């Protein structure tokens, strides 16, 4: 076990490997911990045999965190070969340099897409021959790269120690926010966003809004709490009677207090922010993502937009992921399935044309404007090159 990176048993195989009964969520976690105690670096348990679950919930556990991947149960037919197929798909996605979280998300989606493609046809054939689907075993067929948004699982993230059972899962703030009756955040006023400047002071807001820019983000990095509050207040006042949609980075409580249009949060921020308070205040919400797993984490929230990055290497901030590239960006846009998208990270004049061709609604830029010799000319050149003019 200690020679492999990940073990992928189903429920029955987990029970056999650990010599423990697995009959509910508590015993499932106990068995996973037993297997990790035997040397497994990480464990991914497929939930298809977990009779106690409402949905099919696969679980991934490693030293630092736990992820759950949930899909609706498929009632018709018994599809054989999906476990081997998932493990093979997982290995293939890892070889293609996807991080483990994204590789698992894609492997789960791949099997789901195979199931949704295979079973209806084979069940129809069985019905035509008056064969009961409950008594029939079908065999999985290979498929291409998963592309249908409905094939992808809901992904939930948990730190170690916060994964024990269904009740514990309900305490997850993101699940609470996405299960709210009014789960949609307010829509953007303009979805054809164009160039999206991300700036660090109200002075930049004042310089740029006369260009007719449709969206900007104020990301204040330094200053006292009072100075930050004043900058946010002034920025909101500056654009209040314009068409510019101003998002405040991180400071969601000040954004609510001062009546901002919207707030932008990173992955770490959504763990601690009161998302229902943001929604109740009528603020729009943009969220940063860095791959398939994080997109699937936030899609259920129906945010006002999803930021996709970082596309190219960037020195603007330390990033938790590798550059994604334009090919992956195009897949991310398709996965967001109607939720407005913003590309971000290392985008400049020479790269912006290829980024725009992916179909993103907006393209966020930082140094391409703020470090330009003539920022307003740089903004206009970016608009022109991207085809947003």
What are these regions (language model features)?
Residues 15-16, 76-100:
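Short, small-residue alpha-helix embedded
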Residues 207-219:
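Catalytic domains of carbohydrate-active enzymes, especially glycoside hydrolases
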């Amino acid at each position: 076990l200690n020679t492999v990176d990940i073990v992928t048993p189903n429920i029955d195989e987990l029970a056999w490997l650990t010599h423990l009964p697995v009959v509910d969520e508590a015993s499932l976690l106990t068995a996973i911990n037993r297997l990790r105690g035997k040397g497994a670096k990480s464990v991914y348990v497929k939930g298809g045999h977990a009779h106690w679950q409402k949905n099919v919930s696969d679980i991934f556990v490693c030293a630092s965190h736990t992820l759950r991947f949930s899909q609706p149960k498929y009632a018709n037919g018994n599809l054989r070969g999906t476990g081997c197929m998932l493990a093979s798909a997982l290995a293939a996605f890892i070889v293609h340099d996807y991080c483990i979280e994204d590789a698992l998300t894609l492997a789960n989606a791949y099997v789901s897409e195979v199931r949704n493609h295979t079973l209806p046809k084979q069940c129809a054939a069985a019905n035509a021959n008056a064969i009961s689907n409950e008594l029939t075993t079908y065999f999985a067929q290979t498929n291409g790269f998963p592309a249908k948004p409905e094939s992808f699982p809901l992904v939930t993230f948990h730190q170690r120690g916060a994964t024990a059972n269904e009740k514990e899962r309900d305490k997850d703030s993101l699940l609470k926010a996405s299960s709210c009756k009014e789960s949609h955040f307010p829509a953007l006023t303009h979805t054809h966003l164009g160039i999206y400047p991300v700036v660090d002071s109200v002075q930049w807001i004042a310089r740029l809004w006369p260009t007719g820019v449709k969206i900007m983000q104020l990301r204040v990095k330094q200053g006292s709490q009072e100075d930050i509050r004043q900058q946010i207040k002034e920025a909101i006042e500056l654009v209040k009677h314009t068409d510019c949609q101003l998002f405040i980075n991180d400071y969601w409580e000040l954004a609510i207090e001062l009546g901002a249009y919207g707030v932008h949060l990173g992955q770490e921020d959504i763990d601690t922010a009161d998302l229902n308070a943001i929604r109740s205040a009528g603020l729009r919400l943009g969220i940063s993502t860095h791959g398939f797993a994080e997109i699937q984490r936030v899609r259920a929230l129906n945010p006002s937009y999803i930021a996709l990055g970082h596309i190219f290497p960037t020195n603007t901030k330390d990033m938790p992921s590798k550059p994604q590239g334009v090919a992956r960006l195009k897949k991310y846009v398709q996965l967001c399935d109607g939720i407005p998208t913003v590309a971000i990270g290392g985008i400049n004049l020479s790269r912006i044309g290829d980024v725009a061709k992916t179909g993103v609604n907006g393209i966020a830029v930082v140094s391409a404007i703020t470090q330009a010799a003539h920022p307003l000319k740089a903004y206009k050149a970016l608009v022109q090159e991207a085809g947003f003019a």
